[in-house]
Structures are given as structure tokens and as C-alpha cells.
Amino acid sequence: MCGIVGYIGTRPAAPMLIKGLHQLEYRGYDSAGIALNHENNQPFIIYKEKGKVSNLETAVINDQPAATVGIGHTRWATHGEPSTTNAHPHLSMSGEIVIVHNGIIENYKELKEQLERKGYIFKSQTDTEVLCNLIDYVYQRNGRQLMAAVSRALYHAIGAYAIVVMECKDSSHVVCARKASPLVIGVSEDNTEYFIGSDATPMVEYTKRVVYLDDGQIADVRRGEDINLINLSDHSAADVNVKEINLDIAALSKGGYPHYMIKEIFDQPRCMRDCMRGRIVRVRDYSGNGEHYEVHLSALKNFKAKLIRARHVIIVACGTSWHAGLIGKHLIEQMCRIRVEVEYASEFRYSNPVVEKDDVVIAISQSGETADTLAAIQLAKEKGALVFGIVNGVGSSIARETDTGIYIHVGPEIGVASTKAFTGQVTVLAMLALALGNALGTITEEEYQQTCHELTVIPDKINQILEQNDRIKELSAMFADRHNALYLGRGFNYPVALEGALKLKEISYIHAEGYPAAEMKHGPLALVDEHMPIVFVATHQGQYQKIISNMQEVQSRKGRILAIVSEGDSVAGRICEHVIEIPHTLNALVPLLSVIPMQMLAYHVAVAKGLNVDMPRNLAKSVTVE
């Protein structure tokens, strides 16, 4: 998502900050800015630009500002559109406090209303400006002590944050804090320089000594002094643990992983939380005695009535996004009782499709630039349909061309083979189905609450699967010298079988086919022999007994079976050569778990074959030609 940099030292801060922002560009962003504190009790020098860091750099170089303390930020919009006004850093109304922030303040609307009643005026649409003025409000009423003001303000803020704050009266320090969003402080040998970042990438050139802030910690970082580190929960002093790192910049951008793909696979729990943050919220009951879940999707604000009236939804997408669309079909049909078709965008645009003015077309794309999907959107608009976009690329062509939509907010996906974008797309489709089903009354309140809760714990269950990485690496050996493979599933897991097969063929160059398990006997069974690896998705949810029968058919023909099964399964293990267990969840959400071993398996097969995992031959990340 966004990126934070900070510098406290003896060198000119502006070029240090710009260089740091360049090194965080891989995280993705739509605008950038820096704030400089050049002299006590003097106004901050602030530069903000929409678009690339290079735009910001031009403005800064032309001015050559003098300051040795500053903070910087690359923003990826979550509250408020991409614009210079909404870009960070944000200045308080008094002009005395400036802040950069990663994360989402979930109760920012309530805080904003409270501050407006106290006379505060806001310039942007962001939750960050609200937090900045909340700190300012406390600061002005508590002796203008920055550390105390930040601590007290954060007590009232609900959500996730990594923040760095400066005060204009003291140009020798910054205050930073974190909760559920990373923040790192680099330390020079003599404490004359400190470097701050969302990760260690911006500082590794200057120091190998870093302090990783833990959740719920706040730090006062002052030039020439030791870091003052406090636990927010009880205001007790915390130990400052300086660690030595020994990584180059390229390795750090991959988080220490050997490839972007495996990093992105392991990023998925965090990415899912980012995707749901501020969208699935726990709200106190009117009685005040309990809490319940609500799905808040700003994309529905002006279009809910038309979405509810729709009796026909068409999902258009390509590749992995098409597989997510197939899962979306199941979700929307089951929760909303609306008829859904899923079309390849490349076929839809040339088929003279039947689209009525009350229909809804959902366009799904990771990049937001897929040429065939853009053409399908144009056709749908010409026919009068409401077009709803689900994309990762903020400010992308699809985001601009659709009537409304939802960003998946999983951060930039570098590996060509999509992983975290897929789970982000399915998560958004689940939230959309929940919101519409609740509005339509086609799911019960119990189902709504149960599904919301289960979505929020899926990231923890993905972590359990990721712990099996070493074992899945061992299992990949059964594929490394094969030329063909079958992937089979039923119901919600049929699209997962398609996705698993696509992942294997994309990066390992092994021909693989995904099929509905019941259709195996209508052709693919002829391919089964003692050399053919077959992957079954055989979880307890759905048509379990049926797929066990399908597995027995393969076993009787000496096929080599690897099955993805529910935790504690005692039946499949007697039929299969190998099993991978995944935690239990609701049938509708199983794909978010069952796809994870598929991704890991494909990765390890490709690595074992010595292939370029992140850049497979003949493929591009964003398909911008038809």
C-alpha cells in the first residue's frame, strides 16, 4: 500500500526523502509529498504532487529547501480520490502539526464531526487529516507536548496506523507510532542520524542498524539522543532493540523472499485485512450490550437501488480474474438470488451480448488496464448497463471508465502469475454479495453475521496453511518431471481447480487442465495412468461424498492423487498418495483457503525446474493489447 519515509540528521533532508520515496515506489501509489521542518517556530515547507515521485522531485529540486528534518509519503487512495489535496503530508488547521499516515482510521467520520463542532475546518476527504487535527486539538490543550498529544489522540482512534508526526516549534525530532501497519527506524552509529520507513528499503544504503516498532508502541526520535520508546497501552518504557540487517535493496523489496511470487503468496493474510479494513466493521448494538458486523461499501452509496433492482448480472474478466468471477457468480446467486453469467471479456465484446438497461456488468481486472475488459465495459455502457469495476490499480483506466466500483487494495502485484489479487477479488465479491443480500433480505441475519465473522478470520486460517510451506515444497517433486496434470473440484472449488491448473501451466510450463470433477468421466479419465498427477479439492463443505467417489475412480486407474482436504479428514488419506489439510470454513469461503496450496505448489514446481518464477516466458503482467 502506501509508503512512509523520514529523516532526522545533519544532511539536507529533501534529497534523502525523495530518494527514499523512489525506493518505495514498488509498493504502489497515486500521489507523493514531503514536509520539511527547517527552523523552530517557522512554518513547515510542504510539497505535494499527484502522480509520480519524479513530479515531486522536480518541484523540490527547483527550490532546494534547507532543512535537516523531514517526513515523506507515497499515497494509495483509501479515503478520498487521488489528488494533491488528499496527498500526504497533512497539516493541522493551526499549522503547528504535520503528519504522514499509512492505514485506515475506521471511526474518522465520528471524530471529524466532533472536531467540526469544535471549530475545525477540513480541506481534504481523508481520515489522515482528521487524525492530524485530533492530535492538534489535544496538543493545544495539554501544554503543546507532542509525544503526550499523539499518545492521547491515538487512544480515541479506532483502526490501523503507522504515523510520523512533526511539530513546528521543535525542528529536532519526530514522533512515530504504529498499530497493525509496519514502521522501521534506522539508527546511525553515533545517533546523529535517524531514518524512518515503512520498511528498511529507504535506509539500508545508510545504516544496517534498525529498530522495528512493535504494535502499540510510540517513539520520540530526536537528533543526537537515544530513542524514547513507550508502550501505548500502559505508557511504560519499552526496550529499544537495535537489530543488524544484511540485505541489499532488491532483496528488501522482496521482503527477504527469493521471488516476488512467494512474497505475494505470504502477503495474502495482510492483504486480505487491508481489503476488508473499514469495510467489514463491528458496530455496537443499539442496546449497548453487544456488537454486530456491518458491511460498508462506499461504492454502493449512490448505486444501491439500481444494484438491488438488477435481475441479471454479467461478470466480464480475463485469466485469473475470470476464475474469481466464477466464484463471484456462486456468491451472488446464493446470497442475492440474482442470475449471474460470467463471460471472458474477449468473447463478450464480439458476441453481440444480450444486455438490458437494468442489467449490471461487473468488470474485474488486477491492473485495471486489460484491453479486452476495457472494450467490454465500453460495449456494456453503450447498451445502457450499470458498470461496476473491481480493480487493484488505483486511478487505472477501468477505475475511471466504470460507473462505480471497489478497489481490492492488496498493494502492487509484481509477479506475473496473480496470487494476492485473486484472493482480494474474491474477498471483494464476497463483501458485495453480503451487502446486496442483506439489503435484499435474501440471506438471514444469522447467515450475514456468520459470514462476516468468518471472512474476518480467514487471514489467520491462511497463515495456518502457509506454515505447511516446507511440506508442499516436498510434494512438488511429484510434478517436476511430468508433462501433464489434472485439477478437479466441484461447486465453489471448481473455479479453484481452474486457477490451480492455470498457475501450474503459467510458471512451470507443465500442461494442466482444470475440470469439474463429475465431468472427468466424460473425457479426461482417458488420460489417467500411473504417471499422471491429479489434484483434487475435496473439502468437507459441498459435495464431499461425490468427490470421494471421483477420487476412487482415479485410484482404480492408478492415478497419482494429491488432495486438498479439510482438517481432520480420515477418509481421503486412505485413497490418496498425499493430502494437504486446510482449516474448516463456510462453503462459500472455501476458495480463499483451498487456492493457497495450489499457489504454493505451482511456485515450488517452477523453482525446482529452475524457471523464472516472476517473469514466465511469453506472458505480461498487464495485457494492454487485444
Task: Walk through the language-model features, giving the residues of each.
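Glycine-rich oxoanion-binding loops at beta->alpha junctions
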Residues: 68-85, 283-305, 328-364, 370, ...
